[in-house]
UniProtKB/Swiss-Prot annotation:
Gene name tied to this protein: rpsE
One Pfam family from the record: Ribosomal_S5_C
GO cellular component: small ribosomal subunit
Function: With S4 and S12 plays an important role in translational accuracy. Located at the back of the 30S subunit body where it stabilizes the conformation of the head with respect to the body.
UniProt xrefs under InterPro entries: Ribosomal_Su5_D2-typ_SF (IPR020568), Ribosomal_uS5 (IPR000851), Ribosomal_uS5_bac-type (IPR005712), Ribosomal_uS5_C (IPR005324), Ribosomal_uS5_N (IPR013810), Ribosomal_uS5_N_CS (IPR018192), Ribsml_uS5_D2-typ_fold_subgr (IPR014721)
Protein name: Small ribosomal subunit protein uS5
Membrane-traversing stretches: none
Organism: Symbiobacterium thermophilum (strain DSM 24528 / JCM 14929 / IAM 14863 / T)
PANTHER family, sorted: MITOCHONDRIAL RIBOSOMAL PROTEIN S5
Subunit structure: Part of the 30S ribosomal subunit. Contacts proteins S4 and S8.
Amino acid sequence: MARNENVQGELKEKMVDLRRVAKTVKGGRRMSFSAVVVVGDGNGRVGAGLGKAAEIPEAVRKGTEDAKKHMIKIPLNGTTIPHEVIGRFGAGKVLLKPASPGTGVIAGGAVRAVLEAAGVRDILTKSLGSNNAANQVLATLAGLRQLKSAEEVAKLRGKPVEQILG
């Protein structure tokens, strides 16, 4: 288990980014910490949160609480995602493509953390645009939010699932 991973109940949490930030005031700079935390159950539920505080543990705790509040459920096709999708947030853009079993998670740091927490085992990704960890995490979540299962698509189109799958 990595240094910045915690298994709490059935939720796995991982700190993706920690930064020291400064607010300039009359008397100088006021330092604090900003933490991006990803939380997931490894079975299709994942969330991300941002916490800010004067101390590191407090920033991580706030980020974890925020992530738990903003969890989403994603449809999985076995160990991968149902279809290709592009997630965008700010200047960050993440391309997510389904992969055949045994491929593994082909992704960079921040995107990998989100996908592993969600329980995706086989996927191909490409990060485009911003390489800011917070933007990449939120772009990945935006992409995962767009995913629809074959059943959902069939219901929306008013067609049988077999016709959608081909």
